[in-house]
Amino acid sequence: MSIEFSKYQGLGNDFILIDNRSSHTPLVSPEQAIKMCDRHFGIGADGVIFVLPGTANTDYTMRIFNSDGSEPQMCGNGIRCLARFIAHLEGGETLGKTYQIDTLAGVISPRLEAQGQVKVDMGTPYLLAKEIPTTLGNSNDKVINHSLEVAGQTWLVTCVSMGNPHCITFVKDVWGIDLPTLGPQFEHHPGFPERTNTEFIEVVRRDYVKMRVWERGAGITLACGTGACASVVAGVLTNQCDRYCIVELPGGNLTIEWSEMDNRIYMTGPAELVFTGIYNL
């Protein structure tokens, strides 16, 4: 069996996009997704994204399998890629066009902007420990600058969910962090029953930060959209960032705004088609 695909990337966070509008069930299994994402023996990607029929009042449904076969609730860079892929499927891009996308994290609304940019209404952040979820602190409290022991060190962490869990810690130098060693230990820390994404943040100015990320189920990636959103929220909660902030990632920059008007987070960044092809399953 063969399947058509398109590969997109958002700041180097790359995905295999599949037109799954004919079925409510992904056309590829998690095991097959692992093989497709393999950078030596497959197409190579951080995950596989499926465009399924919409439900209720949504236009489409988004499902994702990570490169390890796990299924996250949402992916910020991925949904920007999804929006441009949908525009291609519909016959072309219309600036200002907004899609209502059903995800496991709720309904997300990406809007097509000029020069390949996509602005996404990421919804409101979840801040209580039980919503992350994490067992750090009291379940009905926010987790802000909480002490966490990892790799023989004490880290001050702030936890935020964007529909998926994030653990954010602020450091002096993001490039001085041993991410391959620390990332897995944060991800699998017993304080996070569903594992966690982990962001290391260096504040350059209140409106500009640098970020490196270890993604749950994907490891080190060049960018993470939900992580950038969660990190700005953490920066505001710890009084280190403004609500409008540029996040510099290894793959490029994202513009994040946590609106005081409606408490929603807006993420703007690029998404680009890399190539299309046919894969033999």
From Swiss-Prot:
GO terms for biological process: lysine biosynthetic process via diaminopimelate. NCBIfam families: DapF (TIGR00652). This is Diaminopimelate epimerase. Its EC number is 5.1.1.7. Its main location: cytoplasm. The active site is at residues 75, 224. HAMAP family: DAP_epimerase. Homodimer. It is found in: Cytoplasm. The record marks 166, 215 as: Could be important to modulate the pK values of the two catalytic cysteine residues. The gene is dapF. Belongs to the diaminopimelate epimerase family. Signal peptide: none annotated. It comes from the Bacteria. One of its GO terms (cellular component) is cytosol. The keyword DNA-binding does not apply. Substrate binds at residues 13, 66, 76-77, 164, 197, 215-216, 225-226. Pathway: Amino-acid biosynthesis; L-lysine biosynthesis via DAP pathway; DL-2,6-diaminopimelate from LL-2,6-diaminopimelate: step 1/1.
